[in-house]
């Protein structure tokens, strides 16, 4: 049968071609200018906190290995609190369970804001950092498990090398004087935030034991009241500084105490309280365009407390390990626990993050932003291998505070974080000249509208 001219033309017509102005999707682009400013402010605050964190850890190590080390351990193990409520804890435990809940409260605020109002609410911008963070959790966990596969006792520490310490990482950036472009800083912070979310989930599901249903259910009452008041009177709590301390803080403390009594690690309460805070302003208050929401206001109020007090005190009580001289250090580093942690953080993190990012770019036919090369992703991936605060916490949950494996795990965490910081320094310092050019490019505003051109190009692309 002969095809008609119309049918033949339809059959023979070439496949549609993409529009001439179509561009491949960019990975590690600049995102929005507002998000860049916000994250830049967060990282500047974390730089000071990171310096305090490192100083606290160094002081603890020196004190724990000095002739007066007994006084350090006596201070760390000194108990205080109300025993009938199961709250008679050592100072070290108060730092881990209590003060660190403030850190996780901020994590909850940051996570909710990123997924409600930040760049992560857009799938095309969130898929790469979220997937890279997942790869940066999975590969280190597998490497640690492979090293400790024949020891069920030490295998419990598989989650130790999964988290990234953003405060420590940005402190390293400040020390080496890196001009890391904002797009890479945003990528690093996003990795750390998603890492924290995964770590919180791991702590809640794998490191909670003897869960008591009654206090857990009771905790829902103050938590629900806290959420209702924060949502209903968000403008009031944002405008009146002391109101949140007088009304919301007691509800938060009761929630924390009941979660602690339930057997679930109390830091999870901090995350839940952070999730309960509204991100956007209500319509009655002018909506999102009228100014920062309650979550951002609380973040400004609590970040100095977290970065300047809570996390450094936790590091002080957690990082103090009696190494026992060079012989003791060698023994600690020969433990499969320490070997697994070092290999997981120094090798597993870069492999997981960079490998996942590379696979995604190939699978989606995306490309890196023209300002960056794969060596830049590698440098940031090395920085992500600095696992400190959450890693120290998971080590204590895995092996018990002050146990031999716990001490060896902490030595491994410290050694791995130091090694990752040194390697990241070598890579990123070598690229500083290119980063300075990118930094200058970020300042160009040819149309004088207050928004640098790179962010406008990003939004149009």
UniProtKB/Swiss-Prot annotation:
Residue pairs linked by disulfide bridges in the UniProt entry: none
Gene3D superfamilies: Na+/H+ antiporter like domain
Record-linked InterPro entries: Na/H_antiporter_dom_sf, NhaA
Naturally occurring in which organism (per UniProt): Arthrobacter sp. (strain FB24)
Annotated keywords: Antiport, Cell membrane, Ion transport, Membrane, Sodium, Sodium transport, Transmembrane, Transmembrane helix, Transport
Superkingdom of origin organism: Bacteria
Catalyzed reactions per annotation: Na(+)(in) + 2 H(+)(out) = Na(+)(out) + 2 H(+)(in)
Region of interest: Disordered: 1-23
HAMAP family xref list: NhaA
Gene name of the encoded protein: nhaA
Function noted in UniProt: Na(+)/H(+) antiporter that extrudes sodium in exchange for external protons.
Main location: membrane
Membrane topology (UniProt): Multi-pass membrane protein
Transmembrane segments: 48-68, 89-109, 127-147, 157-177, 186-206, 211-231, 236-256, 257-277, 305-325, 339-359, 374-394, 408-428
GO biological process assignments: regulation of pH
Localisation: Cell membrane
Pfam family, one: Na_H_antiport_1
Single GO term (MF): sodium:proton antiporter activity
Entry coiled-coil feature ranges: none
Entry GO terms, CC: plasma membrane
Protein name: Na(+)/H(+) antiporter NhaA
Family to which this protein belongs: Belongs to the NhaA Na(+)/H(+) (TC 2.A.33) antiporter family.
């Amino acid at each position: 049968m002969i095809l008609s001219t119309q049918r033949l033309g339809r059959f023979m017509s070439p496949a549609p071609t993409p529009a001439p102005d179509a561009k491949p999707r960019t990975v590690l682009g600049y995102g929005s200018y507002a998000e860049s400013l916000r994250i830049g402010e967060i990282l500047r605050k974390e730089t000071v906190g990171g310096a305090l964190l490192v100083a606290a850890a160094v002081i603890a190590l020196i004190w724990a290995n000095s002739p007066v080390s007994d006084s350090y351990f006596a201070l760390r193990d000194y108990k205080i609190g109300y025993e009938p409520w199961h709250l008679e804890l050592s100072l070290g435990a108060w730092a881990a369970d209590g003060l660190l809940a403030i850190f996780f409260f901020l994590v909850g605020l940051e996570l909710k804001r990123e997924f409600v109002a930040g760049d992560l609410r857009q799938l095309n911008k969130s898929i790469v950092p979220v997937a890279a963070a997942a790869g940066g959790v999975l590969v280190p966990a597998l490497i640690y498990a492979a090293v400790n596969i024949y020891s069920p006792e030490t295998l419990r520490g598989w989650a130790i090398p999964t988290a990234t310490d953003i405060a420590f990482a940005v402190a390293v950036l400040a020390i080496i004087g890196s001009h890391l472009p904002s797009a890479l800083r945003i990528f690093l912070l996003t990795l750390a935030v998603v890492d924290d979310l995964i770590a919180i989930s791991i702590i809640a599901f794998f490191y909670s034991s003897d869960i008591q249903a009654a206090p857990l259910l009771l905790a829902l009452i103050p938590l629900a009241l806290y959420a209702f008041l924060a949502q209903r009177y968000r403008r009031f709590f944002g405008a009146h500084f002391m109101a949140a301390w007088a009304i919301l803080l007691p509800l938060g403390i009761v929630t924390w105490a009941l979660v602690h009594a339930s057997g679930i690690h109390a830091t999870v309460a901090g995350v839940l309280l952070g999730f309960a805070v509204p991100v956007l302003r209500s319509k009655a208050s002018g909506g999102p365009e009228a100014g920062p929401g309650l979550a951002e206001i609380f973040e400004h109020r609590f970040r100095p407390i977290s970065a300047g007090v809570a996390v450094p005190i936790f590091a002080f009580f957690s990082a103090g390990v009696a190494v026992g001289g060079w012989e003791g250090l060698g023994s600690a580093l020969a433990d499969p626990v320490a070997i697994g942690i070092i290999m997981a953080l120094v090798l597993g993190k870069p492999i997981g993050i960079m490998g996942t990012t590379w696979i995604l770019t190939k699978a989606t036919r995306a490309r890196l932003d023209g300002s960056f090369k794969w060596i830049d992703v590698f440098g940031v991936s090395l920085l992500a291998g600095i696992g400190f605060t959450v890693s120290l916490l998971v080590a204590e949950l895995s092996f018990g505070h002050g146990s031999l494996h716990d001490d060896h795990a902490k030595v491994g965490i410290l050694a791995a974080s130091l090694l990752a910081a040194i390697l990241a320094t070598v890579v990123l310092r070598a690229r500083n000249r290119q980063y300075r050019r990118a930094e200058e490019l970020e300042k160009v505003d040819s149309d004088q509208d207050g928004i640098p051109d790179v962010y406008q190009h990003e939004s149009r692309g």
